[in-house]
Swiss-Prot record:
The keyword Translocase does not apply. It comes from Oryza sativa subsp. japonica. InterPro entries: Ribosomal_uL18_bac-type, Ribosomal_uL18_bac/euk. Binds 5S rRNA, forms part of the central protuberance of the 50S subunit. This is Large ribosomal subunit protein uL18c. SUPFAM superfamilies: Translational machinery components (SSF53137). Pfam families: Ribosomal_L18p. Belongs to the universal ribosomal protein uL18 family. Part of the 50S ribosomal subunit; contacts the 5S rRNA.
């Protein structure tokens, strides 16, 4: 069997160490072809795609935006929620402009809203009422609802229901 240069170097190093230190080092030999095949067959490569909840939400939102678009007649009611705030805006996608917006960041609303650990369902209902009233003042009665990739549950549902109850049609 032919020895590789690396194997020859390892043998030479072992002989040098063994001779100079007086420590016996066992002989280094190359694996037999069957051993090499067995070792090579044990190598397993696994590719795992890791996704985060935020990445999943963005993917849902991209899928949703392919189907939902706001027009001048029916603008898009877009909702975004974070851990601290809740935002809603009515957007005309043909002109790329925001027509109406409401959020927990607005000074007029933040004075009325009291919460410490992020917006609650009651806060979402208040935002839904405000956005619906603002839309009706501007003459907007029909919108397309864009949940922003979030599940239609909890705060998102409360905002949508409050907007419907106050005159928006979607």
């Amino acid at each position: 069997m032919l020895a590789s240069p690396a194997l020859a170097g390892a043998r030479a190093f072992a002989a040098t160490v063994s001779g100079s230190l007086g420590i016996p080092i066992p002989a280094i030999s190359a694996p037999s072809p069957s051993q090499a095949r067995r070792r090579a067959s044990l190598v397993v490569v696994a590719k795992v795609k890791v996704s985060t909840p935020q990445a999943d939400r963005i993917a849902r939102h991209v899928r949703l935006r392919k189907k939902v678009s706001g027009t001048t007649e029916r603008p898009r009611l877009s909702v975004f929620r974070s851990n601290k705030h809740l935002y809603a805006q009515v957007i005309d996608d043909t002109k790329s402009c925001t027509l109406v917006s409401a959020s927990t960041m607005h000074k007029s609303l933040s004075k009325d809203l009291e919460y410490s650990a992020g917006p609650t369902v009651e806060v979402a209902q208040k935002i839904g009422e405000v956005i619906a009233k603002s839309c009706l003042e501007k003459g907007i009665t029909k919108v397309v609802f864009d949940r922003g990739g979030f599940l239609y549950h909890g705060r998102i549902k409360a905002l949508a229901d409050a907007a419907r109850e106050n005159g928006l049609d979607f």
